Amino acid sequence: MRSEILASAFLGLAVRSIISLYSYSGFDSPPMHGDYEAQRHWQEITVNLAVGEWYTNSSNNDLQYWGLDYPPLTAYHSYLVGRIGASIDPRFVELHKSRGFESKEHKRFMRATVVSADVLIYLPAMLLLAYSLDKAFRSDDKLFLFTLVAAYPGQTLIDNGHFQYNNISLGFAAVAIAAILRRRFYAAAFFFTLALNYKQMELYHSLPFFAFLLGECVSQKSFASFIAEISRIAAVVLGTFAILWVPWLGSLQAVLQVLHRLFPVARGVFEDKVANVWCAVNVVWKLKKHISNDQMALVCIACTLIASLPTNVLLFRRRTNVGFLLALFNTSLAFFLFSFQVHEKTILLTALPALFLLKCWPDEMILFLEVTVFSMLPLLARDELLVPAVVATVAFHLIFKCFDSKSKLSNEYPLKYIANISQILMISVVVASLTVPAPTKYPDLWPLIISVTSCGHFFLFFLWGNVQQFSSKLS
């Protein structure tokens, strides 16, 4: 089994290395470039400026040009990578002069930093979670799960293609999930706090962790035990936050400035054509014309909480392993569909529990994971990553078919037809978008069709996930 696991890991690394050869976000596209330049610029800022200046606008730190808008752990990571880059070539992070810097050597360095995070954090974390699931369920599915995780094109195309470090926050979150399954609650609190302090979008996973851990505390045999347990978990969370935020804790204004950067209400409810409810509604009813940003933020918070509460209340009352994974799936999907300032890439947060729910619902989850890649195609097409996206998705589906003994499609005809219709629809839209030019009057027609189609799928999966959590014997 170890040799097969190792082979799957090398398969995943090979796919990542191949995708790394392709273009990235903002290549040769001045003046703003893209996410690649954002990551490079954060290295420039953190290496050259004092810690207290990282989130503050100044002549040396123009926040309008890719200002740092992720939590402190991302900033520390940028500093580390920037220091390594500066030792290779100081031009990589030279203050002001390195803006928009591009070279073959720099691309190799930046790509290597993402693959290093895959090797050191993401893949080991996913393997730990696969082993933890096997232990929790007394099964032997780790090769099936880990192979599909390693081959999942969504994370690979965004991190190793488009260019981000989702692998780090997702890796920490995976370790936290594994800790929950192993009933190591202090470790779960610690690693989830790390994930949240790397990317604030990990809030998508926060309610299930809160509900599960609070439920465990409430279930203690005495009030004294409850106080002791909740105090220890709170100490882990607050202590980790304090250590990571210590450079800013001396000033309330400094803390508020960081929070302002992390939650920028002024940007609007969504950017581009993201596959969530608000983008779909905006097709027929222009939100910005009728609702202010502040009002829309409150609407989003209310809708997200209403959509998330049932699954988490049930998890609080009935804490099972499958129920926890379903709560992560349902809650993160509710956040994606209804929350404020959603990006295409944040669907990866729902893909994380979906990859491990393949264990229980392989056919449903493989379709969902394919839709996640489909929903990001406009973004990937802009980065000239459409070819690797299609090839990687087909390969992912074929790898799943190699484990076809787990499939139920052969004897569940409604599910088979639904899956076939969805796949034909997605293929047809992709082919049409490549062969039929959008009308001049509607240049974003195809991205909009992709986002609305994906949103419809995601909403149905959200309903399905809640039905499963409330009715399935597994949960």
Swiss-Prot record:
Pfam families named among the record's database cross-references: Alg6_Alg8
Pathway: Protein modification; protein glycosylation
Single GO biological process annotation from the record: protein N-linked glycosylation
GO MF terms, alphabetically ordered: dolichyl pyrophosphate Man9GlcNAc2 alpha-1,3-glucosyltransferase activity; glucosyltransferase activity
KO phenotype (gene knockout): Larval lethality. Larvae lacking maternal gny present patterning and morphological defects, including the failure to form a normal head skeleton, a discontinuous cuticle and irregular body contours. Larvae lacking maternal and zygotic gny show severe reduction in cuticle deposition and a complete failure of denticle formation and melanization.
Swiss-Prot/TrEMBL catalytic activity: an alpha-D-Man-(1->2)-alpha-D-Man-(1->2)-alpha-D-Man-(1->3)-[alpha-D-Man-(1->2)-alpha-D-Man-(1->3)-[alpha-D-Man-(1->2)-alpha-D-Man-(1->6)]-alpha-D-Man-(1->6)]-beta-D-Man-(1->4)-beta-D-GlcNAc-(1->4)-alpha-D-GlcNAc-diphospho-di-trans,poly-cis-dolichol + a di-trans,poly-cis-dolichyl beta-D-glucosyl phosphate = an alpha-D-Glc-(1->3)-alpha-D-Man-(1->2)-alpha-D-Man-(1->2)-alpha-D-Man-(1->3)-[alpha-D-Man-(1->2)-alpha-D-Man-(1->3)-[alpha-D-Man-(1->2)-alpha-D-Man-(1->6)]-alpha-D-Man-(1->6)]-beta-D-Man-(1->4)-beta-D-GlcNAc-(1->4)-alpha-D-GlcNAc-diphospho-di-trans,poly-cis-dolichol + a di-trans,poly-cis-dolichyl phosphate + H(+)
Keywords: Endoplasmic reticulum, Glycosyltransferase, Membrane, Transferase, Transmembrane, Transmembrane helix
EC number in record: 2.4.1.267
Superkingdom of origin: Eukaryota
TM region positions: 114-133, 161-181, 235-255, 296-316, 322-342, 385-405, 418-438, 441-461
Topology of this chain in the membrane: Multi-pass membrane protein
Role: Adds the first glucose residue to the lipid-linked oligosaccharide precursor for N-linked glycosylation. Transfers glucose from dolichyl phosphate glucose (Dol-P-Glc) onto the lipid-linked oligosaccharide Man(9)GlcNAc(2)-PP-Dol. Involved in cuticle differentiation.
Family named by the database record: Belongs to the ALG6/ALG8 glucosyltransferase family.
Protein name per the record: Probable dolichyl pyrophosphate Man9GlcNAc2 alpha-1,3-glucosyltransferase
Gene this chain is encoded by: gny
